[in-house]
A protein has these predicted regions:
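Hydrolase catalytic cores
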Residues: 53-83, 153-228
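Extracytoplasmic/secreted envelope proteins and their assembly/folding machinery
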Residues: 54-57, 100-104, 132, 186-193, ...
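Structured lumen-facing ectodomains of secretory-pathway proteins
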Residues: 1-154, 162-164, 232, 240-246
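Marks the mature luminal ectodomains of secretory-pathway proteins
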Residues: 88, 126-129, 135, 142-146, ...
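Secreted peptidase-domain scaffold signal
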Residues: 2, 25-27, 126-127, 131-136, ...
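Short coil/turn segments at secondary-structure boundaries
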Residues: 118-119, 224-227, 272
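Active-site-adjacent structural elements in folded domains
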Residues: 30-31, 172-180, 273-277
Length: 301
């Protein structure tokens, strides 16, 4: 995290053209070494992209920077991973495309730009939730089976999670880190299933899965551009809503034998499976499916 700073110069990395023979190319992304003392006690302003964060920060530190501010445009905010081997603080600044260009231009054209910075704190913005990660899998399934993929989505971007035993901070405490990817989304989904199983120990795996899918949040979900509404090939049935899943009034069951019989390689038809999704690759205009629900709310289905 950044310490508090007072009247420190913010210097744009793009002022360095020493690493290129083309005068129109610069080192704004900080992926090449800067000249000695290029920053000399300044905070470096570096654009995201091309190389990883550690390279940017270490290049700036070697040139005398006391901190790094990485800016990016048109992407959801991210955590700056891989900084364990760096020696100066670094932060991430998310801006719109227009604001990012204007900000860099201002710092470049109005040097020296002095900044004050309070100590790093926590900022929560609910608008950054339910946005599809740009690295996440999209449907339909790779084998074109007539079963919707992905089926369900869970939080998997910028998750505050405990790290493995043995990773400790300077105070001897086990750290928490921000992680992302399948390593986050998958345990959220598995954990949701385990909790539903604890509530309803008599339910089958298929019933538990259907409870999670049938109650998922499927509105106000966005693609990675943070603007375009997401669709079923982005989120499947939606984002896990564990509270509603535990209160579902309907579930769907399916047998092992039926899953085996639905194998297309053996002449089966996956779209006939009693699952909580509907997909028909040959559907033109109008098509139909048959599904069977079981009431678990104490009233007839």
């Amino acid at each position: 995290p950044f310490p508090a700073l007072d009247d420190v110069e913010l210097k744009w990395a793009g002022d360095d053209t020493s690493s290129s023979t083309d005068p129109y190319e610069d080192n704004r992304q900080g992926c090449n070494a800067f000249p000695d003392n290029f920053f000399d006690g300044d905070v470096a302003l570096i654009r995201r992209g091309v190389c990883n964060f550690a390279i940017k920060v270490n290049n700036a530190a070697a040139a005398g920077a006391i901190g790094v501010l990485v800016y990016a445009d048109n992407r959801p905010p991210i955590s700056m991973g891989g900084l364990e081997a760096t020696t100066i603080p670094a932060g991430f600044l998310y801006l719109s495309p227009v604001d990012a260009a204007a900000f860099a231009d201002y710092v470049d054209l109005n040097a020296p730009v002095l900044i004050d910075m309070t100590a790093t704190g926590r900022y929560i913005n609910d608008d950054w939730g339910d946005i599809k990660a740009d690295f996440s899998y999209r449907g339909p399934g790779a084998n074109n089976f007539e079963v919707l993929k992905p089926e369900i989505t869970a939080p998997g971007l910028e998750i505050l999670a405990g790290v493995a035993d043995g990773v400790i901070d300077d105070d001897g405490l086990v750290q928490a880190e921000l992680y992302q990817g399948t390593s986050m989304s998958s345990p959220h989904t598995a954990g949701a299933g385990a909790l539903i199983k604890a509530l309803h120990p008599d339910w089958s795996a298929a019933e538990i899965k259907s409870a999670i899918m049938l109650t998922a949040k499927n509105t106000d979900l966005l693609k990675e551009d943070m603007d375009t509404p997401a669709d079923a090939f982005d989120f499947g049935s939606g984002r896990v809503n564990l509270t509603l899943a535990g209160l579902t009034g309907l579930v769907m069951d399916e047998t092992y034998d039926n899953f085996v019989a639905a194998d297309p390689a053996a002449g089966g038809d996956p779209k006939e499976l009693n699952v909580a999704s509907l997909q028909n690759n040959a559907c033109v205009g109008e098509c139909s499916w048959t599904r069977t629900f079981t009431s678990v709310a104490g009233v007839p289905a």
